[in-house]
């Protein structure tokens, strides 16, 4: 009914809050199609981050009353510019460390929290010795049973929790440093056939382009 007058701006306040998950997901695509056809700006108020990521073309993240980053959902999620943004959108593992090398094609971070060295395949134009954080999303970590020996991007820990979600499982890993890390893996095998179980020793590895290096 609100679209009959062809407004320039339409405010939607928790429009999908009363719907179940499947209907909510279907309605998200319907709202996107309507907005695309009409070309009207929609401002959506929601407490559901997945809903915000799905419906938005631009997201603004505020911290202490100031906008700290504006970008597409992909930019906000994959390339946060601060720890606050990385932690606010989705789930993230943050490893504090010291910059050992900073070259145009890579950086090397020594992290006591990770219990090893973190190699990233791009430079950040900062001085060696600087305090930095490596942000690593749970789904970008590969989990294997047993202990592997790699020069970097390989840390060890013990499985302390497993949450079976149907299409995926969330693993809570206690690193040897004492830090807890979250890992998300798709369930490609049936639950009874899963290789990794509670209290197993595991290795966590990731690609060099997976972490984002943050200075603040």
Predicted segments with their positions:
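A generic structural signal for ordered secondary structure
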Residues: 12, 35, 53, 60, ...
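Short beta-strand-centered aromatic/proline hotspots
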Residues: 97
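ABC ATPase nucleotide-binding domains
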Residues: 1-87
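Non-catalytic connector elements of ABC transporters
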Residues: 92, 102-216
């Amino acid at each position: 009914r609100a679209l009959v007058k062809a407004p320039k701006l339409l405010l939607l306040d928790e429009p999908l809050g009363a719907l179940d998950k499947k209907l909510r997901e279907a309605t998200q695509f319907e709202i996107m199609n309507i907005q695309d056809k009409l070309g009207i700006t929609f401002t959506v108020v929601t407490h559901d981050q997945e809903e915000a990521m799905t419906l938005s073309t631009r997201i603004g993240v505020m911290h202490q009353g100031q906008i700290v980053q504006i970008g597409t959902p992909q930019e906000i999620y994959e390339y946060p510019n601060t720890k606050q943004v990385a932690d606010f959108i989705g789930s993230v593992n943050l490893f504090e460390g010291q910059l050992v090398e900073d070259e145009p094609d890579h950086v090397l971070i020594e992290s006591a929290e990770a219990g090893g060295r973190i190699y990233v395949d791009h430079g950040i134009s900062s001085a060696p010795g600087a305090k930095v954080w490596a942000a690593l999303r749970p789904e970008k970590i590969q989990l294997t049973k047993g202990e592997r020996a790699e020069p970097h991007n390989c840390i060890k820990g013990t499985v302390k929790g497993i949450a079976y979600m149907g299409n995926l499982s969330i693993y809570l890993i206690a690193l040897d440093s004492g830090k807890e890390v979250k890992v998300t893996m798709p369930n490609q095998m049936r639950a009874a056939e899963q290789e990794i179980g509670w209290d197993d020793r595991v290795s966590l590895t990731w690609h060099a382009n997976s972490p984002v290096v943050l200075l603040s």
